[in-house]
Amino acid sequence: MTTCLIVDDDPKILEYVSKYIEREHFETIVQSSAENALSYLETHQVDIAIVDVMMGKMSGFELCKILKEDFDIPVIMLTARDALSDKEQAYLTGTDDYVTKPFEVKELMFRIKAVLKRYNVNINNEVSIGNLTLNQSYLEIQSSSKSMNLPNKEFQLLFLLASNPRQVFNRDALIEKIWGFDYEGDERTVDVHIKRLRKRLEKIDASVTIHTVRGLGYKVDDHV
């Protein structure tokens, strides 16, 4: 799943942008400051960053420079400042695109996809493993002879595992990616969803299985 980091000190912008992008089947990570964003990136990877210019101690210009030089992440800047000098500064710091507020989030989505295409980031809504094809737009899994629609969280969980075959994910990583970093429920919800997915996979195609790696987490294997 394509991951988009959104950095803005306005909670309304964070909610507005993240909700729309998630409907396009992207994973979103929201941070309210440049410092928090950099702390997150010390242990996580993202595919693109949407960065507001005017923030607290560290400006969006400074953050963009670091993201480009140290992390090589595509960046789109958001700002209410539309002076030519501001645009020049943004591009000099390395931004890939520049969007002025107020903006249509649909247009922002077009720009995100265009930038990702230039970086050859796969934003395909389908992934195949074994004899199965997972279609993210319809929350559907298909084999050669059967198809099945899954509940959203179950599908996203399977899609993540299938997109990274044989990679082991622990519960914390799965919860953060599927339920969000602010999830406060029982971590055993992962086990419940995995159990349901195993039963569904048995019905549609036994060649794809979810394995428990004792003490580590879960991974998907295919036996084709």
From Swiss-Prot:
Residues 3-116 form the Response regulatory domain. Phosphorylated by HssS. The keyword Disulfide bond does not apply. Pfam families: Response_reg, Trans_reg_C. The modification 4-aspartylphosphate is found at residue 52. Residues 124-222 bind DNA. This is Heme response regulator HssR. It comes from Staphylococcus saprophyticus subsp. saprophyticus (strain ATCC 15305 / DSM 20229 / NCIMB 8711 / NCTC 7292 / S-41). The gene is hssR.
